[in-house]
Amino acid sequence: MIFFLKLDDVDRQHLTGLVNTIVFLHTHRSIAMPITQNEAEQIANQIAPIFNPVLNAYDFEKYPFESYQAFRDAFTNLNPTNNDISNALIWKWGHWGKLNFPQAHRNLIQEIQGLFPIYRLEIGDHTPQNTFNWWSQHLNRASTFITVAFITHLIHHEAFIPIIDQHNFRGMNALLRTLRPLMLIKKKPSNWEDIINLKNFMISIHNHYTETTHSEIDRFLMMYGKQYVKRV
């Protein structure tokens, strides 16, 4: 038997508000609690047998490591040339070696080239979070989160700020969910907390899988999330 409830306007407003709140929490949720050492050890043991095959799927022709190191060091020293900035963003967006790519990306490159001297003058105590906040405020649109996070990584890679994207974020969440089957999963990263969660996850895994490097764990998570985890 099916029952139909008659809702007045107040009930509808309350129900709509509740639904909107649930949608907001579903969209913005992050990892409920930090990864424990026991969980990190279990995940390290879980990925060890597949680590190298997954890692070897990474495309170094599309993302050449030597080129990355060159512009990364320029950013870390706070003196990237316009060419360094262009190369870095073309690399991140997967356009390396391409002559044609979206005009919106060309415009964003020019915008960041214009902003970098201002950042260098204004930032003062350039902690990773201050850097992230500065670029978030100046680019100030949701579509630039991954780019802002990448700039923050380039400047602060020595602080183990990861190259976050939807793939390694998805990989992290999928591995955590093998131990937390009821854990809600956020679809895409969108804020500073997500970056820190990924950073702490990678450090914890590395502590229990020391024959790997942080860079290798990053690439593994990218390929694992891209090729082995179902997108939701």
Residue ranges and their predicted role:
Residues 22, 31, 40-136:
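Long, highly charged, low-complexity intrinsically disordered interaction regions
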Residues 3-71, 79, 83, 162-232:
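C-terminal accessory module of base-excision DNA glycosylases/AP lyases that mediates lesion recognition
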Residues 132-157:
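Helix-hairpin-helix
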Residues 1-4, 12-15, 86, 105, ...:
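Generic N-terminal initiation segments characterized by hydrophobic and/or small/turn-forming residues
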Residues 116-123, 138-139, 160, 176, ...:
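Generic hydrophobic, helix-prone segments enriched in Leu/Val/Ile
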Residues 95-96, 157, 223-227:
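A short structural micro-motif
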